[in-house]
Amino acid sequence: GADNIIIKQYFDGAGFQNFNINGTMINDLITTLHGSDSNDWMSAWSDNGVTIKGEGGNDTINGGNGDDILDGGTGNDWLYGGNGNDTYIFGKGYGNDTIEDWGGSSIVKLKDISSSEVTITNLWDSTLEMTVNGTEDKLTINGYKWNQGGYTFEFADGAVGTVNKDTWELE
């Protein structure tokens, strides 16, 4: 079965705390990280794919080299994908999230947003901004032209959008 490790009062320390767990490969075991309703900083610098859920608060989430799933949840979050083929989750009520991704092909799943509900803007010739019409929610992708694999957007209504360098297509 799945084992859990709970470290109580981990964040009460004055700085980073290190724990050694002998007899196991901890990177191979961790597949999902959950944040809290506070402002979290979470990182999974691993070559394995990890799911990281920020929950509430203004979170900073780092995916690493694997094919990760990053879900900031509510709050204004920064999502750093790393080098893998990453998937980002965004929905209504999520706030203002920002994605930075350095390589691979990226998927943005818009879990409850239809293609007709968004406005897409190209800012400063390298930043894509997707605003959910009628809300305060906004998804910003910094340096989207530098991600060599491009981005695929999967909308709740089944529509698929792609952006690669200077081209936006919606099917």
Q: Which residues are covered by each model-predicted region?
A:
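Acidic, glycine-rich calcium-binding repeat modules characteristic of RTX/beta-roll
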Residues: 1-15, 39-125, 131-149, 154
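Repeat-associated, polar segments at repeat-unit boundaries in modular proteins
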Residues: 16-28, 153-166
